[in-house]
Amino acid sequence: MTVHNDTVEQAAAQPELEQPYRELGLKDDEYAHIREILGRRPTDAELTMYSVMWSEHCSYKSSKTHLRYFGETMTEEMGSKILAGIGENAGVVDIGDGNAVTFRVESHNHPSYVEPHQGAATGVGGIVRDIMAMGARPIAVMDQLRFGPADAPDTKRVLPGVVGGISHYGNCLGLPNIGGETVFDESYSGNPLVNALCVGTLKVDDLKLAFASGTGNKVMLFGSRTGLDGIGGVSVLASDTFEDGAERKLPAVQVGDPFAEKVLIECCLELYKSGIVVGIQDLGGAGLACATSELAAAGDGGMEINLDNVPLRAKDMTAAEILASESQERMCAVVTPENVEKFKEICAHWDVTCAEIGEVTTGKHLIIRHQGEVVVDAPAGTIADEAPVYDRPYARPEWQDALQEFKGVEKQDLTVALKKLVASPALCSRDFITEQYDRYVRGNTVQSHHANAGVLRIDEETGRGIAVSADASGRYTKLDPNMGTRLALAEAYRNVAVTGARPVAITNCLNYGSPENPDVMWQFRESVHGLADGAVELGIPVSGGNVSFYNQTGEEPILPTPVVGVLGVIDDVHKSIGNELGLVEEPEVLVLLGETKDEFGGSIWQQVSAREQGNESENGLNGLPPQVDLANEQRLADFFVGNEGVTAAHDLSEGGLAVTAFEMAKRSGVGLNLDLSKVHEDAFVAAFSESASRVLVATTADRVDMLLHRAEECGVPAVVIGQTTDNGELELGGESIAVSELREAWAATLPDLFGHAVGANSVVE
């Protein structure tokens, strides 16, 4: 059957044909600019390409003006180890000895609300392909998840599906899930956040970039066939113009096949090893429209594509549909003519569908044909790189001052408060979630479950490895976006440092409400400045990132949620520092590093006590978040690198010292006796304040003096606050509670809520 296409010839002959550009997310002035670029109206296929590539997701048109600050602040020394940075599929860091590590975090928020399982699964698949496109082997994934209240009916629909999608896709790929975070808050009702992180390794010489160069070189599409799934994933594709009157539902959520991706990974690695790949791009958001325009725009010529050669799995697809499809597990590569057959042989070996769909040309135009007719003829750079950049209004919200007025917190008996905290949805066990993930597949996972950071061995001979952590606090960030983002950076940095790894690079995923809201844009700008300035203070670069806007339900935006990931390198993973206390014959001494202040703004105790008092809508959020001096984080990192006097270490964050002590003891059941008077004059502050730059460490009695001396040398405040005991009790300020009692309360909450979740993973109506 011949499909009706709107051709370039028809566009010139029918200049005033009405087009559904508003339905596709384009504004009047944007559409007018497209007509100006082309000198005519766009064809349906061209309109599709511009609409998806000029979408917020692909073009960063509302955030780009602020994201430039990362480049403006990065020093030459910081950038010296970056092999690929902001603007590439993923950041790549040179870690020495000819080796490199690449990592990135990406959002898949809206699809995961519509269809939780597939939305989350394809989020994992997409970030893995970003890593593959850099020439790397993916070695691990992590996730940052945000949902509405744990007891809300919609959370019971969304959470099991999201977790199932992540676990199914990651487990089938054979990639260990080495850590993550799950947070519940009213602001995420109707708009969950699903941020997936992937890390990969490669040789420096094997780095691949997304560009098409060399006139006459061939464009190869390989992987799964192209279908109707995912159309409209990054913009709105809802016009009958593109369907020629046919009545069919075009699902905006992609459908993933992890086994196809697993084979695609191995196929890519063999292609890289063969040395025949000139440039490569994965097909994710905006599909072939993105891959072809970006490859051509980044190269030294133009490109011609024949859509008749694209392997399809649906009949009668129009050119617009083929270009906008976000069918998963696809890659696009550029190879020299003499290597086409070798390319096809390798794909055939892995049973991967492959087709030659075009070639690199002279000039700067992207020309696309379908059924013998030209349906796209446009400068590639205008599609990929020249979306309008908006300097949207931003202003400090009128309500910010009132929000920052601290109203105090109710103080209760220490053990009573501690049990409430560990049993709360905010801090209770996530085993219900994490036990669905394979954490040790491939055999290189050193730390993951309940650890400060995921630790992986990357060299079996030397024991060299990496540590990765990702953190965020929407509560802190709403109170003070700049400081809240710095706190997320500080915690991720500290989590990596306490393993004994040296932090070397940063990635991020910035999740916010509508950029058309000046309040939101102020939050976003403050966060960008906090992260960029913080990176300079720590002396490590931001290697890449992602922005997700329009996260809101109605007019109510989510908590501003900057997810910050930090990568560290450790010389010998066998010497990495764990975070759990064991049962040993001789008591271990507990030392608190860092200074404790009366800081409860945005704290978990503030949230839990507010809910207890019936202030659920407010979540008790008020005051200023803890203040962080990133120089203190650097001193802590110096303390831990190469420190063999520490037997266990755990950073202090949500819930403060008491929660950290429980987390260190819960697995073994060992008792702890803590003298809170050494921490702060107020026992409640000592137990539950969330002051930054603090770590609880354990050491043997004969190494205490050495440890304290090293702390002094590094400029880190340190004080002995207690020791382990054999009575199984956690003793705090004259009160005590059994560790086993706390563990039972901690373990019961989520299974009780989700053990029989009705309607889990059902598609939203």
From Swiss-Prot:
InterPro entries: PRibForGlyAmidine_synth_PurL (IPR010074), PurL_linker (IPR041609), PurM-like_C_dom (IPR010918), PurM-like_C_sf (IPR036676), PurM-like_N (IPR016188), PurM-like_N_sf (IPR036921)
Keywords for this protein: ATP-binding, Cytoplasm, Ligase, Magnesium, Metal-binding, Nucleotide-binding, Purine biosynthesis
Biological classification of the source: Bacteria, Bacillati, Actinomycetota, Actinomycetes, Mycobacteriales
Active-site residue list: H57, H108
Residues involved in ATP binding: Y60, R104, N508, G545
GO molecular function: ATP binding; magnesium ion binding; phosphoribosylformylglycinamidine synthase activity
SUPFAM superfamilies membership: PurM C-terminal domain-like (SSF56042), PurM N-terminal domain-like (SSF55326)
UniProt pathway: Purine metabolism; IMP biosynthesis via de novo pathway; 5-amino-1-(5-phospho-D-ribosyl)imidazole from N(2)-formyl-N(1)-(5-phospho-D-ribosyl)glycinamide: step 1/2
Binding site for Mg(2+) 2: D130, D282
Listed name of the protein: Phosphoribosylformylglycinamidine synthase subunit PurL
Record note on quaternary structure: Monomer. Part of the FGAM synthase complex composed of 1 PurL, 1 PurQ and 2 PurS subunits.
Binding site for substrate: S107, H108, N109, H110, R129, Q254, E326, S327, Q328, S548
GO BP annotation list: 'de novo' IMP biosynthetic process
Substrates-to-products reaction catalysed: N(2)-formyl-N(1)-(5-phospho-beta-D-ribosyl)glycinamide + L-glutamine + ATP + H2O = 2-formamido-N(1)-(5-O-phospho-beta-D-ribosyl)acetamidine + L-glutamate + ADP + phosphate + H(+)
EC number: 6.3.5.3
